[in-house]
Amino acid sequence: MLEKITFPEHEYQSVQDWLNRQGYCYTTRVYKEVGKYKVGESYLAPWGDILRIDEIQTYRKVSDRPFCDEMSDAEKEEIRKYSEDMGLPYEFIRFSRSI
């Protein structure tokens, strides 16, 4: 039985669109989810896809995150609230569909 990977429901379609278009996607994990997912492991997405973790990068400052300039201020603040402001790291995870 595969473990599940979670996403906010409002992101389901955009994640699937990225996977269809690029073959991979990224997610950011903070606070209690740091360390939960492992490179090379597969997880069940809420919409039924099996997703494989390809790479995990750990950061301490939101400004160090790749594609930071593409994020909204609200997204940056959400990550900062549960990582940088608490003195904790966060993870930037690349994943793809498992074939």
Give the positions of each predicted feature.
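A generic structural signal for short, non-catalytic loop/turn and secondary-structure boundary residues
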Residues: 1, 46, 86-88
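Solvent-exposed, well-ordered amphipathic alpha-helical segments
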Residues: 1-3, 22, 50-52, 96-99
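Compositionally biased, charged N-terminal/linker segments
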Residues: 1-37
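A generic structural signal for short beta-strands and their flanking turns/coil linkers
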Residues: 24, 47-49, 91
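Short, flexible surface segments
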Residues: 36-39, 47
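Cell-wall polysaccharide-cleaving catalytic domain and substrate-binding groove, primarily
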Residues: 38-42, 92
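Short coil-to-beta-strand transition motifs
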Residues: 43-54
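Aromatic- and Lys/Arg-enriched surface recognition patch
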Residues: 55-99
